[in-house]
A protein has these predicted regions:
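Short, solvent-exposed recognition patches
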Residues: 74-76, 215-310
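Flexible, processing/modification-adjacent segments and terminal tails
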Residues: 90-154, 158
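Bacterial N-terminal signal peptides that target proteins for export
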Residues: 1-8
Length: 340
């Protein structure tokens, strides 16, 4: 069926529901399933505010989707220009790119279907459809679902409210709550542009690394990426452990600091400061594990390790005793400079 005809039929069905009085929960769920099933492409912008740390983190997000599994998610954090990142999914896999540092990692992952993604249309609809106990209400402009979340590595954010625009059935607002029912994450969407025609290389790694998409120096870079002094950071979430040893090393690329914690749950944190930026685009590194959000950035998690980059520093957390949730908590607690 022609794409335009499909869109017209979907819009007609939405108007029919609206014209027959207040829509039921099952009516709206059925329409949501049909709408996302017929999507060929979309593009929109969103703002995501994360309130889980000591200070709120605000992201500007540019979202693009092309049927049936191509995604590009641009995440710009004004508080960390070098940390602005891109999540790509294409025929070659899932990638996390940090254009300012010429870094790219490839994951063997079923992202985004492996967990809730509060900024992705398909993921939000999947959460609604998969929760038989979801609560539903209708406001003047929105259909509102209150559902369980599916965060594999963070059980502290169990509930979300998703607001869908009544006219288009696209998401307008997402509120994610912690166990005390405080808003921990809030995502606000701009109107969606449907049926977008993208350039052939729009979802390719090299094109996104060298496009200057964040107005940052990417591609061929010479000299230092930062003039700031290397500051060793210490976690405040210690999980019953204490700092037992600090080791510092000089490397050709810069400095390395290794923090060893011993106690109830032992772990090690490595911090690598690279004084010289990479000089050319290189092939993506294959990263074990799955991509996860940790505060201001996206990291790679396995059962016994968590790696991430922030403010020009590469971090590696390793432990045989910490759970995945605990590793994320330790990593997030390193967001501020702390004394030993």
């Amino acid at each position: 069926m022609n794409r335009v005809v499909r869109v017209v039929l979907i819009l007609l069905s939405i108007f029919i529901i609206a014209g027959c009085g207040q829509a039921s929960q099952e009516d709206v769920k059925k329409e949501l399933e049909e709408v996302v099933g017929d999507l060929t492409s979309y593009q929109t912008k969103a703002k995501m505010e994360m309130l889980t740390g000591e200070t709120a983190q605000l992201y500007e997000i540019d979202l693009a989707y092309q049927s049936d599994h191509f995604y590009r998610v641009l995440m710009h954090n004004e508080g960390d220009e070098e940390g602005s990142q891109i999540i790509l999914k294409n025929d070659d896999g899932v990638f996390v790119l940090t254009p300012a540092l010429n870094k790219s990692f490839r994951f063997q992952s079923d992202w985004p279907s492996n967990a809730s993604q509060p900024y992705l249309y398909h993921s939000l609809v999947a959460d609604v459809l998969n929760d038989d106990q979801a609560e539903f209400k209708v406001t003047d402009q929105y259909y509102v679902f209150k559902t369980q979340t599916n965060y594999q590595h963070n059980k502290t954010l169990p509930i979300q409210e998703v607001y869908f625009d009544q006219d288009s059935l696209t998401p307008y607002l997402v509120k994610i709550y912690d166990a005390d029912h405080n808003v921990a994450v809030e995502v606000t969407f701009e109107p969606f542009e449907l049926g977008v025609e993208f350039e052939p290389n729009f979802f390719e790694v090299d094109a996104n690394l060298t496009s200057g998409i964040f107005s940052l120096p990417v591609g061929l870079i010479e000299g230092e990426h930062s003039q700031s002094e290397f500051i060793v950071r210490y976690p405040t979430a210690l999980m019953g452990a204490e700092l037992s040893e600090t080791a510092e090393f000089d490397r050709e690329e810069g400095k390395r600091v290794v923090l060893t914690y011993q106690g109830e749950k032992e772990f090690t944190i490595v911090q690598d400061y690279n004084e010289t930026a990479m000089v050319a685009v290189r092939e993506p590194e294959l990263s074990a594990g799955v991509p996860v959000h940790i505060g201001k950035t996206i990291g790679a998690m396995t059962d016994q390790s968590l790696t991430w980059s922030e403010n020009g520093v590469d971090y590696y957390l390793a432990s045989e005793q910490l759970t995945r949730e605990e590793m994320i908590e330790v990593a997030q607690s390193m967001g501020q400079q702390m004394e030993k």
